[in-house]
Amino acid sequence: HLLNVKIGMTFSGGVIDFLLFGVLPNRTAWWLVIPVGLVFAVIYYFGFRFAIRKWDLATPGREKTVEEAPKAEAAAAGDLPYEVLAALGGKENIEHLDACITRLRVSVHDIGRVDKDRLKALGAAGVLEVGNNVQAIFGPKSDMLKGQIQDIMQGKAPARAEEKPKTAASEAAESETIASPMSGEIVPLAEVPDQVFSQKMMGDGFAVMPTDGTVVSPVDGKIINVFPTKHAIGIQSAGGHEILIHVGIDTVKLNGQGFEALVKEGDEVKKGQPILRVDLDYVKQNAPSIVTPVIFTNLQAGETVHVNKQGPVARGEDAVVTIR
């Protein structure tokens, strides 16, 4: 306005607007924009550079790193539930505590008291925050953590988590083929409407948009986890890979309605054997999505997931995915 330069713009005020509304009509002193822009560029650069260094602002790439040592110490001492509760702001900060097979779901009174960096140092693969709700991605041990934290809040000594030796995929096997657990359509993880899966916080894998409600084992192996609400099942393959089949999104809230488990923990299963029945119509009506992520939670360094098929797939169809 001071220089009487008048150039219109649509959305971004970028170079296209500059050309269309300034240079081409040639009805205003558009050339003055260039020296003014250069002056502001210098002001912005040195102004923000000074502010960032003066007040140590956490711009991308300059975030403070979190020490990882406390993670091992807490786990070794059996104090993980106490540490997690403290990182959530303590007993008095907890409004509601819940969990599913992937994460702790916590409503808190004061989100400012939640130490997200500490939760990550304690083993959370990620921490999601929406309003006063926190989701800490602790994987299959989330439900055990929930029970232990509830015991602490009630003044009881928490039950010790059963120490299960960590399973490593067999180094002898060069690769392992995975069958589709459901009929439907193969969907990339990136398209799953839950960032815990789409951002691979629990591991790599694939997803199926199912067309019928029978779930079969994608491998020969052993059932290692059947979640109480039956919406998710963990399997250890003969090759040592741990596989999580999570039917639908936010289906933990259905409290088992629409799900019938056909196996129990410890059962040996064969590839293609039915392990779960799902009332898809009920789940469609009561959950955000029926898309079913299949996650490999213990991939070793250098192992990659290769999705060999796109589009329609049949339940039990072999080699839709290869791990190698």
UniProtKB/Swiss-Prot annotation:
UniProt function note: The phosphoenolpyruvate-dependent sugar phosphotransferase system (sugar PTS), a major carbohydrate active transport system, catalyzes the phosphorylation of incoming sugar substrates concomitantly with their translocation across the cell membrane. This system is involved in glucose transport.
UniProt keyword Transferase present: yes
Protein name: PTS system glucose-specific EIICBA component
Domain-related comment: The EIIC domain forms the PTS system translocation channel and contains the specific substrate-binding site. The EIIB domain is phosphorylated by phospho-EIIA on a cysteinyl or histidyl residue, depending on the transported sugar. Then, it transfers the phosphoryl group to the sugar substrate concomitantly with the sugar uptake processed by the EIIC domain.
Domain named PTS EIIA type-1: residues: 194-298
Lineage, uppermost ranks: Bacteria, Bacillati, Bacillota, Bacilli, Bacillales
Keyword set includes Transferase: yes
CDD domains: PTS_IIA_glc, PTS_IIB_glc
Catalysed transformations (reactions): N(pros)-phospho-L-histidyl-[protein] + D-glucose(out) = D-glucose 6-phosphate(in) + L-histidyl-[protein]
EC number in record: 2.7.1.199
Membrane topology: Multi-pass membrane protein
Keywords: Cell membrane, Kinase, Membrane, Phosphotransferase system, Sugar transport, Transferase, Transmembrane, Transmembrane helix, Transport
GO cellular component: a single term: plasma membrane
Biased composition (Low complexity): 167-177
Span list, region Disordered: 156-177
Bilayer-spanning residue ranges: 5-25, 28-48
Subcellular location(s) of the protein: Cell membrane
UniProt enzyme class: transferase
Domain called PTS EIIB type-1: residue spans: 78-159
Every PTS EIIC type-1 domain range: 1-63
Active site annotation, chain numbering: 100, 246
One of the GO biological process terms: phosphoenolpyruvate-dependent sugar phosphotransferase system
GO molecular-function terms, A-Z: kinase activity; protein-N(PI)-phosphohistidine-sugar phosphotransferase activity
